[in-house]
Curated annotation (Swiss-Prot):
It comes from the Bacteria. Pathway: One-carbon metabolism; tetrahydrofolate interconversion. This is Bifunctional protein FolD. It comes from Shouchella clausii (strain KSM-K16) (Alkalihalobacillus clausii). One of its GO terms (biological process) is L-histidine biosynthetic process. Its EC number is 1.5.1.5, 3.5.4.9. The lineage of its organism: Bacteria, Bacillati, Bacillota, Bacilli, Bacillales. Pfam families: THF_DHG_CYH, THF_DHG_CYH_C. GO terms for molecular function: methenyltetrahydrofolate cyclohydrolase activity; methylenetetrahydrofolate dehydrogenase (NADP+) activity. NADP(+) binds at residues 166-168, 191. The gene is folD. Keywords: Amino-acid biosynthesis, Histidine biosynthesis, Hydrolase, Methionine biosynthesis, Multifunctional enzyme, NADP, One-carbon metabolism, Oxidoreductase, Purine biosynthesis. The keyword NADP applies. Homodimer.
Length: 279
């Protein structure tokens, strides 16, 4: 098999941000500065890093980043009050509650408190339902990034058999719905699926979203398949055993530098679009 096409997320991300810079400038002409509010509950180091990365990405593009840090003892009631305040703040266009939250908080209730027009990461129940029906303004950012990569490289989706390994509500489930809405035939595998390899071996498109390092083995990949690795594990390792998968795939995302950069760009894109809709 020839060398696979490397699906460079940094390149896709740059193209998205170049276009967004023009949109931000146009909004500034109207006296509007896009604003993303991020809520971090507790002091989890990984979550703090993710919030900082998102804030830095906002600033580089001229988007205001409003960071709200709450103590880990915060109650559901207190968090809901903070979200309601942001909902009522017309200068805030997007609200992101960093996942996961401490165990005493009802995360679903917190997500669903976010106003649908500010749900730039597609986490509300209503946003999830709109995504399933194919008319969400703001689908979950990582699934949106996966579709953006496929489209950027003009890789066909319609009529292809896509196997999604993972069923999380912020990745596996929504990306399955988005692929289905693009006329792929979709199979979802999960922790209770027996013989996952039997399904992956038949896939034209493999989406790895299982959260286990090197879970997808190279010998599982059908020759010529497209592999999108949405996993990011300790040591900069994805969910796919990269070298083995790359030997059989026609196209593959690296980790890091694949899906991750595009995910952040989709968050920025949704925030700018929310600001445009507010004018």
């Amino acid at each position: 098999m020839a060398e696979p096409m490397i699906l460079d997320g940094n390149d896709v991300s740059k193209r998205i941000k170049d276009k967004l810079a023009l949109q931000v400038a146009a909004l500034e002409q109207k006296g509007v500065r896009p604003c993303l509010a991020t809520i971090l509950v507790g002091d989890d180091p990984a979550s703090a890093t993710y919030v900082r990365m998102k804030g830095n990405a906002c600033k580089r593009l001229g988007i205001e980043s409003k960071k709200i840090e709450l103590p880990k003892e915060t109650t559901t009631k207190e968090l809901l009050a903070v979200i309601r305040e942001l909902n009522n703040d017309s200068s805030v266009h997007g609200i992101l509650l960093q996942h996961p939250v401490p165990s005493q908080i009802d995360e679903r209730a917190a997500f669903d408190e976010i106003a649908i027009e500010k749900d730039v990461d597609g986490v509300t129940t209503l946003g999830f339902a709109q995504n399933a029906f194919g008319f969400a303004h703001y689908p979950s950012c990582t699934p949106a990034a996966i579709l953006a990569i496929l489209d950027h490289y003009q890789l066909p989706i319609e009529g292809k058999h896509a196997v999604v390994v993972g069923r999380s509500p912020i990745l596996g489930k929504p990306v399955s719905q988005m692929l289905l809405n693009r006329n792929a035939t979709v199979t979802i595998c999960h922790s209770r699926t027996e013989n996952v390899s039997d399904f992956v071996e038949k896939a034209d498109i493999v989406v790895a979203a299982v959260g286990k390092p090197n879970f997808i083995q190279g010998e599982w990949i059908k020759s010529g398949a497209v592999v999108l690795d949405a996993g990011y594990n300790k040591g900069n390792i994805g969910d796919c055993e990269y070298d083995g998968c790359a030997q059989r795939a026609s196209a593959i995302t690296p980790v890091p530098g694949g899906v991750g950069p595009v995910t952040i760009s989709m968050l920025l894109k949704h925030t700018v679009e929310a600001a445009e809709r507010s004018v």
